[in-house]
Amino acid sequence: MEKKTMEFEINNGLWTIEEVSEEEMIREGEKDYTLGLTIYKTQRILLLRNQKNIKKTLVHELMHVWLYEYGHNAQDRQFNHEDVCEIVASCNDFVSDIAKRFLR
């Protein structure tokens, strides 16, 4: 089976989305129940191939990318209601566009 991949740009960075096997996901250091993984160092999103909710997983991982690229990091533990609304409004077009292109 051919590996599905796609590149996209965000904030002057080039990222790659890849569908991978469970073995490949585990090689990246993740547990066997991981559906998706964002690797900031290499600017890659890995998605477990043949999962039922690949769209949801892809959108989840794209949110990690968007937050990272626009200055939010894993240390940002608290967002108020307005913060969440602003983030969703700001990233919606980007996330929807990339997800549609990959899932075609």
Give residue ranges: language-model regions.
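Short His-Asn-centered micro-motif
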Residues: 47-49
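Active-site recognition of the HExxH zinc-binding catalytic motif
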Residues: 56-68
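Small, basic N-terminal interaction modules of short regulatory proteins
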Residues: 52
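Post-HExxH zinc-binding segment in Zn-dependent metallohydrolases
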Residues: 74-104
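Well-ordered beta-strand scaffold positions
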Residues: 13-15
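Catalytic zinc-binding patch centered on the HExxH motif and its immediate surroundings
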Residues: 1-9, 18-44, 55
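Hydrophobic (often cysteine-bearing) scaffold residues that line and stabilize catalytic clefts
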Residues: 55, 59, 81-84
